[in-house]
Amino acid sequence: MNQFQCCICGRNNSEINQAHRELMLCAQCGSNARFRGLMLGVMRYAFNEESKPLIKQSDRRSITAIGISDSEIYAWPLAAKLSYANTYYHTEPQLDICDLRSIDQYSNIDLIICSDVIEHTPLAPRKVLENMRRMLRPGGILILSAPTYHLPETIEWYPDAASLEVKDCGGRHEVRWSDTSGAKHVDFRPCFHGGPGSTLEMRLIAHQDLIQAGMDAGFEVETLEFSPEIGYVWPIVPEYPGIAAPMDGRVLVLRRPHETPVKGRGYPR
């Protein structure tokens, strides 16, 4: 691919750096290939318009949207177009997608964007997806990404963890954890995203497992296929040390179906 037009800011890019979901940076807004895939999903399924970039979309203030620690690269254009709030784990406006009390502060949402979060959650992906489904109105959309792999099954680094603590041992980090049987474990080589001691990787997710988790959580699920013309594309090749399976990482679009209400009870949560 020699060029692309950024679907966020509209910049035509011809000098393209390394093809990777975290690279292929737009020369104007700085978006990477993953961000552009997310916004393609938003424009296709929320705006129903993908022929023009995000910053030139018409205002859709009737659409309520939640970001889960979204990048400012696309958070500010979304805030300018939608009734959108970017939420955070550690600060306001706060949202913990593993905590029902936090989840239940939000309801009847049209659109949720959750990018590269679900590989870090203490709860398994299916449960987290069930929680996000609670937040959506019937017919609502979740735009989801994770660094998924063509593995036969998801690898959980801390299976059945009941407690977990990251310890800084003189510049070297280790994870001390106990499983539900009470057995204690130490991981001397944990993987962090964003630098040592930052965001702990809890699992390597198989792409098909994430699709199945979405369906098991009550969603209709679609893999958003690549669109090279907007810079949403990367090679699906092995890249994880010691893992031969290729990294996929394509964006998923999950729709909460329109359920038939139960008389006297309304829609199921």
Regions found by a protein language model. Give the residues of each.
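Conserved N-terminal segment of class I S-adenosyl-L-methionine
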Residues: 1-107, 229-238, 246-251, 257-269
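S-adenosyl-L-methionine-dependent methyltransferase catalytic module, highlighting the catalytic core
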Residues: 4, 123-137, 141-268
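A conserved beta-strand element that flanks and buttresses the S-adenosyl-L-methionine
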Residues: 113
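Short catalytic micro-motifs in class I SAM-dependent methyltransferases
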Residues: 116-120
